[in-house]
Amino acid sequence: MDNNVYLLRQLPDGPQVLIDAADAPERILELISAGTTPGVSTEKPGLAAVITTHSHWDHVRALAEVLSATGAEHLAGQADAAAMPAPVTVPLENGQQLDFGGLRLEVIGLRGHTPGSIALLYEAPGTPPQLFTGDSLFPGGVGNTENDPQRFGTLIDDVEQRIFDRLPDGTVVHPGHGRETTLGAERPHLAAWRARGW
């Protein structure tokens, strides 16, 4: 299964943050090493944190190895923490603000795909907001809720209220699988998603 992983850094020399250590730990560690600030003496690649968007197996296959190799903190939604294959050092809640040396992320809880699924919002002046949604929002719909109407209702409500009702159409959505999209491209389909129930 193809997954997206995202390595973020506040330029020029801020700490690196990884979103979803999904698979291929050796490749992820190569990317982290390539981004480590030259001249900084460190025994481990420079990674401040791994943020896991949710506890499903396809988003955590490289987690233990990346954490062990880097000594990074592990952040994830509070309600998913017990299901993670590696300890969560910083449990996250909706609305929490994170700051990694100037790289600021807002935690947006999107319950439904899993109880503790989160998205991460990055905003900077002069650029469109960047939203990392894990498996909660994709081009064409919300994440899988296993045909459970209650879980679907919770997820579509969270997606509408916490994302579409407050963020502009230019917001770029970076999902856990597949290509990116924008909120503007997806907004016209919200009613159809709700009507079909997935």
Predicted regions and their residues:
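Active-site donor-binding loop signature of nucleotide-sugar glycosyltransferases
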Residues: 10, 94, 185
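Metallo-beta-lactamase
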Residues: 14, 38-45, 115-198
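Core dinuclear metal-dependent hydrolase active-site scaffold
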Residues: 7, 96-125
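Active-site HxH/HxHxD metal-binding segment of metal-dependent hydrolases
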Residues: 16, 23-106, 128-129, 189-192, ...
